[in-house]
Amino acid sequence: MSEKRKSNKIIGIDLGTTNSCVSVMEGGQPKVIASSEGTRTTPSIVAFKGGETLVGIPAKRQAVTNPEKTLASTKRFIGRKFSEVESEIKTVPYKVAPNSKGDAVFDVEQKLYTPEEIGAQILMKMKETAEAYLGETVTEAVITVPAYFNDSQRASTKDAGRIAGLDVKRIIPEPTAAALAYGIDKEGDKKIAVFDLGGGTFDISILEIGDGVFEVLSTNGDTHLGGDDFDGVIINWMLDEFKKQEGIDLSKDNMALQRLKDAAEKAKIELSGVSSTEINQPFITIDANGPKHLALTLTRAQFEHLASSLIERTKQPCAQALKDAKLSASDIDDVLLVGGMSRMPAVQAVVKEIFGKEPNKGVNPDEVVAIGAAIQGGVLGGEVKDVLLLDVIPLSLGIETLGGVMTPLVERNTTIPTQKKQIFSTAADNQPAVTIVVLQGERPMAKDNKEIGRFDLTDIPPAPRGHPQIEVTFDIDANGILHVSAKDAASGREQKIRIEASSGLKEDEIQQMIRDAELHKEEDKQRKEASDVKNEADGMIFRAEKAVKDYHDKIPAELVKEIEEHIEKVRQAIKEDASTTAIKAASDELSTRMQKIGEAMQAQSASAAASSAANAQGGPNINSEDLKKHSFSTRPPAGGSASSTDNIEDADVEIVDKPE
C-alpha cells in the first residue's frame, strides 16, 4: 500500500477532560470530524487490557470490569505534582502515585505512565481520525487548554502533542477558541464573556471582538472545578443512600464505584431535560443474604441542592474577570456557554444572575472549542485571512527576591507574546552566584505561589552588595510558555531556561516516549490486522458451511468432503492462534474450494439449459454426459482460419434419434 501524502492542514484538537474533539478547515469552513465509531466526540479514556491499549469508546465500554486499568479524566493531573492533586485522587478508581521527582503519574500493574503519555494516546486517536477523513498524513495541530492552565500544564500539553507525533503550532485557551468560532462571521464590535464549565475545569474569559481582531481582556477560573465534581456529589449521595438502606459501604469496591460513576454521569445529563430520573443498578454487590440492588430516584431539585456549593464557586472568578477587564456586567453584549456542564439549568440560571442576561445557546458546547482551534489552524496555515488573536497570560509571573517576596515581572492578563526585563542585584557582599526562582501566582509571598522553575547564574565578579547589575528577562511566546534569562552586565555571563512542565519531562524522555508511542502504534496495527484476518476467516467458515448446507445435493460428494476438510483447517488455525499468515493461507485455500461450488453449479445450469432447449425443439431429455455425445464442433481447414468465411467446413453432427 502506498504511503499517504503529507497534509498541509493544521488540525484543531480540543483535548478535553471527559471528551475530545477534532476539527479541520475545509473549503474555508471548519468541519468537525466523526470518529471511526461514528461519534463527533471521543471519550478521553485510555485502558490497558490483555496487552492491548484501548482508546475512546472501546476503553469506556470495558471500564466497569477493568476500573484499575482504565484511565479517565487524566487531564486533571497533567503538569502537576502529586502534592497538588489530593482532591482529584479521591475521585478516580485507578492508582495515582508520585514518581522519583514528585510528579503525579499513573501506576498500572507496576508500570508508571505520565499524564503526557496518556494524553498523547488520546491525541493520536484524534490525529488518526483526521487522517482517515483527509486521506493524508497529519503532522501539525493547534491544541486547546483551559484558560487557567498554568505554564507547566501548557508545556505538558505541548509535550503530549509531540509524543503523539504532532508539531503543535499553537496552544490556545478553550474560551478563546470558542470566541473565535462564535465571532468569525460576526460584524461590528462586541464584548463577550465565555463561560466554560467542562469536565474538569472552569474558565471565564472576557473578550472584545471586531473587524477580525479577537482581544482577550481578562481571564479567570478554577482548575479544580468541573463535571467530574458534579458526578462526585451524586456518587456520594448514592453511597450514603445505599448504606442507609442496606448497611453496606460501597466506597471501597472499585467495580461498584465505576458503575456508580457511569450512573451518576447518566443521571446528571438526564436531569438537564427532565425533573427526575431513576437510577437502577441491579446486583451492585452481594453479602451473606444474597445479591443487593441499588434503586433510587433523584430529582432535579435534589441534584441542584447537592451541587449548590459547586455552582456557587463559579461566581467569584466571573466577578474577578469583569473587574480585571474594567467592565461591568451590563457592558457584556453576549455570554457564550461552553462545556457539557453549561447545559445544567441551574448553571444557566447563575450565568443569567451574574451577567443580567440570557446566555447565548447558539453554539454546540461540545464542539465549539475544536472548531475554534481549527480556525486558528487555518489562520496559522494562511487559509483564514484577516483574523488576529490577542491572548493573555492567566496568572502573574515573577521571581523570588530578598525576604521571600514574590516580585512580578509580568502581571496577569498581559497580552502575549510579550517580553519584560528588570534589573536585580546581589543581597550580600562578594556574592558569587544568584539563584533565580521563577514563580507563578498572585500571592505577595514567594512560598504561597507555584514555583515553576529555578536556575543559577554563577561566576559573578566580586563586588559589594547591590552593585552587580543582573538583568532578568521574561519572554512569553504565543503559546503562553515562558523562557527566562539572567545576564550579569559586568561579566557578560548569561544563563537561560525554558520553563519545563512540572512533570519534569526532559528532551530525552520525550524522545523515548515518542519512540514508545510509534512502537505501540505498530503493535496495535498488527493486532488489528490479526483481528481482521480472524474475522474474515470466521466469515469464510460461516459462508462455506451455509453453501455446503444449501447446495449439498447439487454438488459432487467429493467436493463437499474437500470443503469440509478445509473448513476444519481454518477453524483449527484460529483455535491454535496461528500466525496471521497461516490463518490467511488456510482461509485462501478454503476460498479456492468455495469457487468450485460456483463452477459445479454453473455446469449444472448449462446442462439444464441445454436440456430445456432440446425439449423445446421436441428433443429427448438428456443428461450432461449425453450432451457431450450430441455436441457439435466446427474445425477450420488445415492452413485456414476459423474466422475465414471462405473455407468453413460443414459441422460434423452425430444424430442419435431423428425427430419425428
UniProtKB/Swiss-Prot annotation:
Residues 599-660 are annotated as: Disordered. PANTHER family: HEAT SHOCK PROTEIN 70KDA (PTHR19375). HAMAP family: DnaK (MF_00332). Belongs to the heat shock protein 70 family. The modification Phosphothreonine is found at residue 201. Keywords: ATP-binding, Chaperone, Nucleotide-binding, Phosphoprotein, Stress response. SUPFAM superfamilies: Actin-like ATPase domain, Heat shock protein 70kD (HSP70), C-terminal subdomain, Heat shock protein 70kD (HSP70), peptide-binding domain. GO terms for molecular function: ATP binding; ATP-dependent protein folding chaperone; unfolded protein binding. Acts as a chaperone. Disulfide bonds: none annotated. It comes from the Bacteria. This is Chaperone protein DnaK. Induction: By stress conditions e.g. heat shock. Residues 600-617 have a biased composition (Low complexity).
